[in-house]
């Protein structure tokens, strides 16, 4: 069995519980993680032996989910990195894990190369990356506890949020407020690495086979 002791596997879910249980159990089938945790306000049935349950306040909306991911995930992680998965995004090819992924503070499936989308405050298209299956360092998780990371990124003239998701936590961390995380030393994976790590959409530079996925059109199961 593959051992990845540096990484805590996380899923945060109060809805879609059967799919969330499937996703985290599937991600544990051939990997022994540093820790594996199901986060939510109610303990689900059917978790495999490797998965611990840790209670959160109720996650009643997508905004609750996004806020928790930005400001509270750090409380659940004691390893150098965590892998955040979703009910519709999980490990599918454990053999494609690469320890070089740990060189980065954030990796997620690339977004499209579009001059009118995923624009940071300086109008630059940021392509990495999707949060639905994403590797994050403890350093990145701790940034909001050290400096101010604005939540209201859909207000004012500083932010350019074309197609970057308003309150979506991955848009906040990787687009709107990326400069804040980079100023704290966080390094985002290049597209060439992110394309090997995960896939969300079919893009010209997509890899056919990846370590994980999020919301792929293909029925992975």
Spans of features found by a protein language model:
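Short His-Asn-centered micro-motif
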Residues: 14, 39-41, 85-86, 109-110, ...
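Generic structural signal for small/hydrophobic residues in well-ordered secondary structure
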Residues: 36, 87-88, 137
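Short, conserved loop/helix-junction motifs that constitute active-site signature segments
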Residues: 30-31, 76-78, 98-102, 136
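Short glycine-/acidic-enriched loop or helix-start segments at secondary-structure transitions
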Residues: 21, 47-49, 92-96, 145
């Amino acid at each position: 069995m593959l051992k990845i002791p540096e990484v805590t596997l996380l899923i945060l879910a109060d809805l879609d519980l059967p799919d969330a249980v499937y996703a985290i159990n599937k991600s544990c089938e051939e990997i022994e993680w540093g820790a594996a945790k199901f986060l939510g306000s109610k303990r689900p049935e059917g978790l495999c032996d490797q998965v611990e349950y840790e209670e959160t306040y109720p996650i009643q909306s997508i905004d609750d989910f996004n806020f928790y991911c930005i400001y509270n995930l750090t409380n659940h992680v004691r390893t150098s990195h965590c892998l955040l998965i979703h009910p519709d995004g999980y490990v599918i090819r454990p053999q494609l894990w690469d320890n070089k992924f740990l060189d980065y503070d954030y990796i997620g499936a690339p977004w499209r190369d579009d001059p009118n989308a995923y624009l940071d405050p300086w109008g630059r298209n940021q392509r990495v990356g999707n949060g639905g299956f994403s590797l994050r360092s403890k350093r990145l998780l701790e940034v909001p506890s050290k400096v101010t990371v604005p939540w209201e990124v859909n207000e004012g003239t500083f932010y350019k949020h074309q197609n970057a998701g308003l309150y979506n936590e991955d848009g906040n961390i990787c687009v709107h407020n990326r400069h804040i995380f980079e100023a704290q030393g966080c390094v985002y994976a290049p597209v060439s690495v992110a394309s090997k790590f995960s896939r969300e959409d079919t893009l010209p530079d997509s890899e056919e086979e990846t370590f994980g996925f999020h919301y792929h059109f293909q029925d992975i199961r």
